[in-house]
Curated annotation (Swiss-Prot):
Region of interest called Disordered, as start-end residue ranges on this chain: 1-212
Function: Tegument protein that can bind to various RNA transcripts. Plays a role in the attenuation of selective viral and cellular mRNA degradation by modulating the activity of host shutoff RNase UL41/VHS. Also plays a role in the primary envelopment of virions in the perinuclear space, probably by interacting with two nuclear egress proteins UL31 and UL34.
Other remarks in the entry: Expressed in late in the infection.
Keyword Transcription assigned: yes
Annotated source species: Equine herpesvirus 1 (strain V592) (EHV-1)
InterPro entries: Herpes_UL47
The protein, known as: Tegument protein UL47 homolog
Recorded GO CC terms: host cell cytoplasm; host cell nucleus; viral tegument
Domain of life, per lineage: Viruses
């Protein structure tokens, strides 16, 4: 018996049961000490990376030799009762038990910080990542690899000192250069000795690294920093981190918007040129009939039918009404102190570049009296305005900052964005990290330029804003005519057929042409892409960041100032929640959140179109010789803005159609992200309607300064709204293309968004899907935050929960529709429709693999799941 059973002593033995973690996650990386079988089981990530399931022959031989050697100290370590007694009474010293090595995707990153508040509250143990989610992210994201393990693996794509296009690989590899594992490690003394020899060759080598003629700037410091970074990775992580940060700052200073190395296209893209040429010819003219040119003494008389159709006035946000009632300066200040001679001396009282040669300075400032916006804003006034922003009550209860001087505290280390068990809850750790990330993505780029360049004052932003707004109005002129001729030629074939998005929008568009007699200054045949200067590049970037500039908000004066602050704060809250619920390691959202995101994207895009048509008409009225004709009653009448959002029946009906959907109503009240998104939407809707109402009241014999200030305030809000839509669309598209989630979207939302983004090109530089997620990962790395899948670990599970749905939401849905159909289109699959917008939305440099995850279920290697879509 002893001959057959050895250490068991004849006693029966029970096979040890695998742990829960082993049974839930059988695919383990090579080298895991918990595996008891000899053949390594590789995950699908390993299969995609080219690893094989067979070990090295020498390694197999050594393992066999070790297993064949007899044990002299009970090395077999039987787990039976008799074996336990043998070990107790044996003279051999038992080996120290080794704790199993945790999986990298379940362990927090090294050096992860926790606030004292997070450590006070303990929660249940960390739940393992669902196996289906692991397979879904296998070929796109590094779910389980820690930063230390990545540094030890050689990347075959890094063949030079500079990274190639990020689109040549999978998305999440965003061009970060790491040292190869195959390089021989050297001691510090050897490296110091070599540095003396390399110093003599730096001057020659640094200038020979880049041979491309397009790189004209000497970047010796950048090249040297990259080489030092590669060497530091083999020495210590702390030195590597410091050099990486310095390299990143050097690159940012060179290639950030407005930097010396930042390139801007001087002419419209080929796509825009083709879009305008194919849709309208030189001989095309619009002849409008009717009484448009007659004087309109009572603009409200044309809207009496609205009073009978809509029996209840438009509901405004209760929080907005409270903000206005508590505002200390609710009206326009007429005693603004500024010296016209000083403005002329500073070369500020000049015609915007868009109208140079068309209007002289005196004529332009007579039509748009905006010189008061150049008045000096004191530091105390700016500080009080920033403080008013921070003192606004947020949904999450934490203070939000609008500028660099008021940064938030956050915990470094892992960022966990999984849903919480509580309804309307969110992890506080992720929320604080998202606040810091939102500041870095949307605010710090502008604030760094403003604070570091003393020559950048708010009047430069005012000049950019008025110029960009006028250029946008001219693009509205062109787009409205392109849509008219697209409708006329919708049945043509071949070269005469307009672009399909124009045909789809032509029957439902709200961009309507104005009579040629009142829009001569707006006439153009190609799309305007705006100024191309260093300052304009900064003002156009960062998702519409000008609203965060306190001096600029104050320069516009009330009522524009208070409305801009109100909109900026609540859209910032929405984006914080968006960032706190997804990242590259977990790009998906819950079903309810996706429903709310699609609803807001659809309604906000339509609202942007309504507002751009208002800008189109208001700009023509401000520049016209006679501003009381019937062609301008769209902006002169007050009844529309009292009954419908932004004075639009179409938007009124669209809100009823979308918000009355039971799925949308449930999503609105059940998740924190949905509430933040809806409050952000209704904040913009309320502020824009209020500004348009103030404009109509002052346009008839009121203050022209107030009219001009409101006009500029609407432009500032629209820039932030368009940037928010860009932000929201990239998050939603990332869930569809990178997360593999099935998302239904209204068919006309993406065509409408694409056209409006072209129209607003002078005001906003939109960011593509690929660039958005790459920049997001880069900024997380700068903040020392690591995206992690699953829920946070024990001690970091504090939840910020909204106990009840917001009081602002229930009364915002219209009670009934006025007309049949809102022109939103039918529901289609978002991943499929995005394939038609690879240049405008996904990104011109995107590879063909981007988006396949949304078209094919990401169950790589599992035949039962292949081809299925996530429900």
């Amino acid at each position: 018996m002893d001959q057959h059973h050895g250490a068991r002593g004849g006693a029966p033995i029970r096979r040890p049961r695998r742990s829960i973690e082993s049974r839930s996650h059988p695919f383990r990386a090579t080298g895991n000490t918990q595996r008891t079988y000899s053949t390594p089981r590789l995950s699908y990530r390993d299969g995609l990376s080219g690893r094989t399931a067979s070990r090295d022959p020498q390694e197999q031989a050594s393992n066999q030799d070790e297993s064949s050697n007899p044990s002299t100290s009970n090395a077999q370590q039987s787990t039976s009762f008799w074996g336990y007694l043998r070990r107790v009474f044996s003279d051999d010293v038992p080996a120290q038990p080794q704790a199993p090595r945790p999986r990298a995707d379940f362990a927090p990153p090294a050096g992860e910080e926790s606030s004292s508040e997070e450590e006070e509250e303990e929660g249940p143990a960390q739940a393992p990542l669902d196996e289906e989610d692991q397979l879904m992210y296998a070929d796109q994201y590094s779910v389980g690899d820690s930063s230390d393990e990545n540094d030890e693996e050689e990347d075959p794509r890094l063949g030079s000192d500079y990274p190639t296009s990020a689109e040549s690989s999978e998305y999440h590899d965003h061009g970060e250069m790491v040292a190869g594992a195959g390089a021989e490690s050297e001691s510090e003394t050897d490296i110091d000795a070599e540095e003396e020899e390399e110093d003599d060759e730096d001057d020659e080598d640094d200038m020979e690294v880049i041979r491309d003629e397009s790189y004209r700037l000497p970047r010796t410091w950048l090249d040297k920093s990259i080489r030092l970074m590669d060497e530091a990775l083999a020495q210590s992580s702390e030195l590597s981190k410091a050099i990486t940060k310095s390299t990143r700052s050097l690159y940012d200073s060179q290639f950030a918007p407005g930097g010396r190395g930042y390139t801007q296209t001087a002419t419209p893209s080929r796509r825009l040129v083709q879009l305008s040429r194919a849709g309208m010819y030189d001989s095309d003219k619009i002849v409008m009939t009717g009484d448009y040119m007659e004087v309109d003494d009572d603009p409200d008389s044309a809207y009496q039918l609205w009073v009978r159709a809509i029996r209840h006035p438009l509901a405004m946000n209760p929080s907005w009404e409270e903000t206005i009632s508590n505002h200390t300066n609710p009206s326009f200040s007429t005693d603004i102190d500024y010296d016209i001679d000083e403005l002329i001396e500073k070369n500020l009282a000049r015609t915007p570049p868009v109208f140079e040669g068309l209007l002289d300075s005196a004529e332009f400032f007579y039509k748009l009296p905006m010189l008061y916006t150049y008045a000096t804003i004191t530091q105390d006034e700016a500080y009080e305005e920033r403080l008013a922003w921070s003192n606004t009550q947020a949904l999450h209860g934490h203070e939000q900052s609008s500028w660099q001087a008021l940064l938030v505290y956050y915990s470094r280390g892992g960022m966990y964005v999984s849903p919480t068990q509580e309804p309307r809850g969110i992890w506080r750790r992720a929320l604080k990290q998202a606040m810091a990330l939102q500041l870095k993505m949307c605010v710090l780029g502008l604030s760094d330029v403003v604070t570091k360049q003393n020559a950048t004052h708010h009047h430069t932003a005012v000049t950019f804003l008025v110029d960009a707004l006028l250029r946008t109005a001219r693009n509205c002129y062109l787009a409205s005519r392109l849509l008219v001729f697209a409708w006329e030629r919708r049945r043509e074939t071949g070269a005469k057929r307009p672009a399909e998005p124009l045909i789809a929008l032509s029957g439902v568009t709200l961009l309507q042409p104005l009579p040629p007699e009142v829009s001569e200054l707006l006439e153009q045949r190609t799309f305007d892409i705006g100024l191309r200067t260093p300052n304009s590049a900064v003002f156009r970037a960062f998702f519409g960041s000008l609203v965060y500039w306190a001096e600029l908000r104050l320069a516009l004066r009330d009522p524009a100032s208070i409305n801009c602050r109100y909109v900026g704060f609540h859209l910032q809250t929405s984006e914080i929640y968006l960032l706190a619920r997804a990242h590259s390691a977990s790009p998906g959202y819950t079903k309810e959140e996706l429903v709310a995101m699609e609803a807001i994207l659809t309604l906000a895009t339509l609202m942007l179109e309504v507002a751009l048509q208002w800008v189109h008409v208001a700009c023509a009225q401000l520049l016209s010789e006679n501003d009381t004709i019937k062609a301008f009653r769209r902006v002169s009448a007050s009844i529309p803005h009292a009954l419908a959002p932004l004075g639009s029946i179409r938007l009124h009906d669209a809100e009823f159609e979308v918000l009355s959907n039971p799925d949308v109503m449930v999503a609105r009240d059940e998740t924190a992200l949905s509430q933040a998104l809806f409050l952000g939407y209704f904040s913009v809707r309320t502020a824009l309607t209020a500004c348009m109402r103030d404009y109509s009241h002052e346009a008839d014999g009121g203050s022209k300064e107030t009219v001009t200030g409101v006009f500029l305030g609407v432009g500032l809000i629209l820039q932030r709204l368009a940037g928010h839509l860009n932000f929201l669309l990239n998050c939603l598209a990332g869930a569809a293309l990178y997360g593999g989630q099935k998302i239904n979207i209204h068919s006309l939302t993406l065509p409408r968004y694409s056209l409006l983004a072209d129209v607003m090109a002078p005001m906003l530089q939109r960011q593509s899907l690929v660039d958005f997620w790459r920049a997001r990962d880069n900024m997380l790395e700068d903040l020392e935050i690591t995206p992690r899948p699953g829920p946070p670990t024990q001690g970091k599970r504090v939840v910020v929960e909204m106990p009840l749905p917001s009081d602002d939401l229930p009364d915002m849905t219209p009670g009934a529709s006025v007309n049949n159909g809102a022109g939103l289109g039918r529901m289609v699959d978002m991943a499929k429709q995005l394939q038609h917008y690879r240049e405008t939305i996904i990104g011109e440099e995107a590879t063909s693999s981007v988006g396949k995850r949304g078209l094919i279920r990401a169950g790589v290697g599992v035949a039962a799941l292949r081809g299925r879509r996530r429900k």
